[in-house]
């Protein structure tokens, strides 16, 4: 597939997601990184977003709950170039009814080449990066070229 470049802004659009068993862990991480998060645009699946906003006071645009389609809503935003980073504390030891949605969200994040943290260590590396607050060029699929080749 042909590639093109997209410039991520200095103020990133960051999606925050956590499975039920990892919501307390994500909340702790968000509290630890609240100062950094305040300068970015935050999105989350419904239950997670409402909990984080209530507990931290951060402005978070909440989708609907993950099992009800929130993961897919975030995936759509990623494919539209409206999400720059995904912090997803998923539970690798428990299956959830919407596992196919989870896999689709992680797949679409990979397709559109956005940074993804699935645990605290990776989230720490991303948030310690000097690129967090800078414009960053990333290669993404050239959808227009893809479409032209298929029609």
UniProtKB/Swiss-Prot annotation:
Q: Name one Pfam family in it.
A: MGS
Q: Look up keyword Lyase and say if it applies.
A: yes
**Swiss-Prot/TrEMBL catalytic activity:** dihydroxyacetone phosphate = methylglyoxal + phosphate
Where, by residue number, is the active site?
A: 71
GO terms for MF: methylglyoxal synthase activity
- UniProt signal peptide: none
Q: What is its EC number?
A: 4.2.3.3
Which family, according to the similarity comment? Belongs to the methylglyoxal synthase family.
**Could you tell me which NCBIfam families the record lists for this protein?**
MGSA, PRK05234.1
State what protein this is by name: Methylglyoxal synthase
- Which organism was this protein described from? Vibrio vulnificus (strain YJ016)
Q: Which gene encodes it?
A: mgsA
């Amino acid at each position: 597939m042909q590639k093109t470049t997209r410039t991520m802004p200095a103020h990133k659009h960051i999606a925050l997601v956590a499975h039920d068993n990892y919501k307390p862990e994500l909340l702790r991480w968000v509290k630890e990184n609240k100062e950094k998060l305040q300068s970015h645009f935050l999105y989350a699946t419904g239950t997670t977003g409402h909990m984080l906003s209530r507990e931290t006071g951060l402005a978070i645009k909440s989708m609907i709950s993950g099992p009800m389609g929130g993961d897919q809503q975030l995936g759509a935003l990623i494919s539209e170039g409206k999400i720059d980073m995904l912090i997803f504390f998923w539970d690798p030891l428990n299956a959830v009814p919407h596992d196919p949605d989870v896999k689709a969200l992680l797949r679409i994040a990979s397709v559109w080449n956005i940074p993804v943290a699935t645990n605290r260590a990776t989230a720490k590396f991303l948030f310690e990066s000097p690129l967090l607050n800078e414009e960053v060029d990333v290669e993404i699929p050239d959808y227009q070229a893809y479409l032209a080749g298929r029609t």
